[in-house]
Structures are given as C-alpha cells and as structure tokens.
Amino acid sequence: MIVRTLEQARQSDRRVKADNWESVRMLLKDDNMGFSFHITTLYANKETPIHYQNHLESVYCISGEGEVETVADGEVHAIKPGTLYVLDKHDKHLLRAFSEMTVACVFNPPLNGKETHDENGVYPLEAETIME
C-alpha cells in the first residue's frame, strides 16, 4: 500500500516548479500504478501552451477559474471547480488561469517526475526519475 500526504510530497523532490505552474507529483511511474497523479497549481493571469504528444491527460478543477482552448478549432471551454476536461486526442491547447487554479491531473503513460514542458509544450516520454 502507498500512503503519502500532499504536504509530504510538497516538501520533497515531487514538487516541480515552472514559470506558470507548480505540480506535486503524488504518484509516478516508479509507483507502478500505470498512471501518474498530480495536484497542480496554475498561477493567476498566465497562459500556458501545451501539446502532450506522448501522454493522455485528464484534469479536474478543484479551485479557481480559467479556460482551455483547443488550438485546432479555437473552441474555448470555461474551467471552474467541478469541471473535468480530458485530452484524449493529444490535443494542442492553451490553458489560461484567470485566478490561481488548483487541479488534479492523471497522466497515461505515467510521468517519471521531473518533466516540464519543452518549447512546444510537450513532456518527454522518458524523463529524469525522482528517487526517494
């Protein structure tokens, strides 16, 4: 059984920071669950271009407000607490946080832990592994 708290993970290498967000990676590839689970905070008034070419992701909004825009068709969807969006087609998208947003994210295949977006908004398929 795996038991860890958000605070424990936040105080460890499982907390990864970037310019527009920070993510606490609660479950990772080495946990052998077949997916990774993250609690991510998106900073207010920021836009993040993302294109997960190697991963599928589901995102559930816990707090805050923003929107997600699919680049291919310009369709915009509001995000508020209780909203789930799923990137099931490796959708290139723009994620905008109007206020600080906290979201729960599930990735398949799972992340190793140290991933941040490259210049194209992509996470690498294999990145540095967090060692505990």
Swiss-Prot record:
Alphabetically sorted, this entry's keywords are:
Lyase
Family, similarity comment: Belongs to the ectoine synthase family.
Task: Write out the GO MF terms.
Answer: ectoine synthase activity
GO biological process terms on file: ectoine biosynthetic process
Q: Which CDD domains match?
A: cupin_EctC
Q: Describe the function of this protein.
A: Catalyzes the circularization of gamma-N-acetyl-alpha,gamma-diaminobutyric acid (ADABA) to ectoine (1,4,5,6-tetrahydro-2-methyl-4-pyrimidine carboxylic acid), which is an excellent osmoprotectant.
Source lineage: Bacteria, Pseudomonadati, Pseudomonadota, Gammaproteobacteria, Oceanospirillales
User: What is the protein name stated in its UniProt record?
Assistant: L-ectoine synthase
Enzyme Commission designation? 4.2.1.108
Q: Which Gene3D superfamilies match?
A: Jelly Rolls
* UniProt superkingdom: Bacteria
Give the encoding gene's name.
Answer: ectC
* PANTHER family documented for this protein: L-ECTOINE SYNTHASE, PTHR39289
Q: Which reaction does it catalyse?
A: (2S)-4-acetamido-2-aminobutanoate = L-ectoine + H2O
In what pathway does it function? Amine and polyamine biosynthesis; ectoine biosynthesis; L-ectoine from L-aspartate 4-semialdehyde: step 3/3
